[in-house]
Amino acid sequence: MSDVTFKHPEYVKNLPYWQKLDDVCEGEDAVKAKGEKYLPKPNAHDQSPANKSAYEAYRTRAVFYEVTGTTSNSLVGAAFATDPSFKFPPELAHLERNANGAGLSAYQLAQNGIRHLLKHYRCALYVDYPAVTPARNLAEFKQQKAYPMIHLLNAIDVINWDSMMIDNQKKLCLVVIREFTSERGADGFSKSEVEQYRVLRLEPDNEGNFIYTVQVYTKGDKGTWKGEDKKYPTDNNGDFWSYIPFTFVGAIDNSEEIKKPPLLPLANLNLAHYRDSADFQESVFYMGQPQFYAKGVNWAWYDEAKKRGIYIGAKVLLPLPENGDLGIVQADPNTLAREAMKDKWEKMKEMGA
């Protein structure tokens, strides 16, 4: 039985990096929500409720500095410090205001693409066109109000791909895209997301020519994935496409090869700094609180004083027994974690943060 959800080995290998970068760039709330994934629990063998509560406090006090996300935004801004020049023929003028059919212009798609490259090393561009009868002239084309759209795809949503040699050229012959469609509930207000897979193929026809096909897979009542009827897109002349209108976009080149995301080293250091912060804030919490003590007293004095109330401060008289004394104990500050934080902070600045 074929499995449309099968994931390319390179996808499986790189997915943890992409998810880590997404969490780190999203900020403190996303990182802390992952709990022990990014902040190991001290005394992890202790599964008691008390240790669980202690860990929650340990995580809450920790500070995650959103260095990686800020750096990503700064780099995108630097890339577009000078407005890029887009040149479109009149038939594609809509790309300047609505390139993807959802209101994003080509300029905004380019900005999002740079952001994907920084976080995931790559993204993808996929060109689609509504299923309409091919227009015979420009007037008919305008009446249809059907425009080609450019879809920018996150690397996480392209789960599988393959290529083959055709006429001494390497061409993509398979692309599997994970998609989510929205379905409104019967009440007219609620909404749920439904997962589906769009499969782009390059398949031989009866004459041995390779043509582009599209097939969408949805989950049936029995929980199995079922492919809908294949569609055979055609160009303006009604001819089948001889290639898949899809391309990977990489930080270095546009090949299928995946390399480490540019921001990964900074994200790893950002998380290490977060763990040091948890240890430092823990020491600040405990060592920053003085502990009062009394000596030369017995339990009878303590019980009587507790009954009447023990007050410490200016203009307050605290009766003590003969040879009694009151003092304050405070631990020496632990600066090791603080020094580790400073060291990592300097290294992050060296990386361009």
Residue ranges and their predicted role:
Residues 1-43, 212-255:
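N-terminal start-of-domain structural block
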Residues 1-158:
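Extended, helix-rich architectural segments
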Residues 25, 33, 67, 75, ...:
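Intrinsically disordered, low-complexity segments enriched in small/polar residues
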Residues 102-105, 164, 168, 261:
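Alpha-helix capping and helix-coil boundary motifs
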Residues 113-117, 128, 163-166, 199-206, ...:
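Short linear motifs in intrinsically disordered
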Residues 118-254:
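Extended, regular secondary-structure scaffolds
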Residues 226-353:
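Extended, charged amphipathic alpha-helical segments
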